[in-house]
A protein has these predicted regions:
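Extended alpha-helical targeting/anchoring segments
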Residues: 1-334
């Protein structure tokens, strides 16, 4: 199953929350019977066809024919079609600068009043666009490579993302989440890069934010893990990407018997880096203050396989196209 879980999915596990209804589905998962998997590291392509179990001889023969047809298509590709694109695109914000600052100040008041420790508020930018986001995705693969490069086309609606952040992984019963908080740009050379990394790892504010998210990750993983299995396996490491560096930790746990990948997503969603702490109260404040529903943004993108394994990233650094409108979202983490 491949697809997304929207930000509003938290209302499933926490019915006390009344999240704004979005123009996109709360979740959308797709089952594919034909898959082309490409291993970029080993430069190896695998063609997979899932066959039905009734009439196995005939189904097997059909699956082999399908594989050969796919291989023939790959080895004799058609010229890449030129995709329609708008050259002059201007985004408009759903907030004026004054309105956004007012939202930030209200968030600060909640922190001073003791409701929350930190909160992540965001605003949406949108534009009219008739082209395909596949063009933008092609460019981003080169200019901003990330651990999770995503392009989805779901019945005409498009999603692209260059997310660096894992929400939750599940592999052979072992859960992992990777809290990320604190950032600096990459340096122009090694000396500047090392200096920025040293500055980041010594920044008390960045470390306080990061520690809060590590605690939140331990709590979220702990809800679905076996007793005494939760541990921090990596702590406050500098992780470098093409244009930015972050402080990253890793939290691990063993999934409780009787639970599965969907329980893992439910427990971790939304990530603390997209909501705040305590998470439930932060989500209530976000819903109160933000004008527009987040939709896919702040949720998760990824897959669940037939062995019950899971890999999802946080739906961030992304764009969504629905109809002729494209939406992007920018956030601000408020911590005092």
């Amino acid at each position: 199953l491949v697809g997304y879980y929207g930000y509003a999915m938290i209302a499933v596990s926490e019915p006390i929350l009344k999240i704004q209804e979005s123009e996109t589905n709360d979740f959308d998962l797709m089952l594919f019977d034909k898959i082309i998997a490409y291993d970029h590291l080993r430069e190896k392509m695998t063609v997979i066809v899932n066959m039905k179990t009734y009439d196995p001889e005939r189904q097997y023969e059909q699956a082999v024919n399908d594989i050969n047809e796919i291989i023939n298509t790959i080895t004799d590709p058609a010229p890449l079609a030129k995709l329609e694109s708008d050259k002059n695109v201007e985004f408009t914000s759903t907030y004026t600068e004054e309105e956004f600052c007012d939202m930030v100040n209200k968030t600060k008041e909640y922190i001073f009043d003791g409701d929350i420790f930190q909160c992540v508020v965001s605003r949406r930018f949108e534009t009219e666009y008739k082209g395909s986001l596949l063009n933008a995705y092609r460019v981003l693969r080169i200019t901003n490579p990330s651990p999770y490069m995503v392009y989805m086309n779901i019945e005409g609606d498009e999603i692209i993302s260059t997310s660096p952040e894992t929400l939750v992984k599940l592999q052979n019963g072992v859960l992992n989440t990777f809290p990320i908080a604190g950032s600096r740009p990459r340096g122009a050379d090694k000396q500047e890069d090392d200096a920025l990394a040293d500055e980041l790892i010594k920044d008390e504010k960045e470390l306080a934010e990061h520690n809060m998210l590590v605690d939140l990750g331990r709590n979220d993983i702990g809800k679905i893990s076996k007793f005494n299995s939760v541990k921090v396996t990596s702590y406050q490491q500098i992780l470098r990407y093409s244009k930015i560096m972050h402080i990253c930790s890793e939290v691990e746990g063993e999934l409780k018997d009787g639970l599965d990948a969907f329980d893992a997503v439910e427990s971790l969603l939304p990530a603390g880096t997209l909501s705040g702490a305590p998470k439930i109260r932060a989500c209530q404040i976000i819903d109160e203050l933000e004008k527009t529903p987040r939709g896919v943004y702040g949720g998760a993108l990824g897959y669940v396989d037939f062995n019950g394994n899971l890999d999802t990233c946080i739906a961030i650094r992304m764009a969504v196209k629905k109809g002729n409108k494209v939406y992007v979202q920018a956030l601000s983490l408020i911590h005092i």
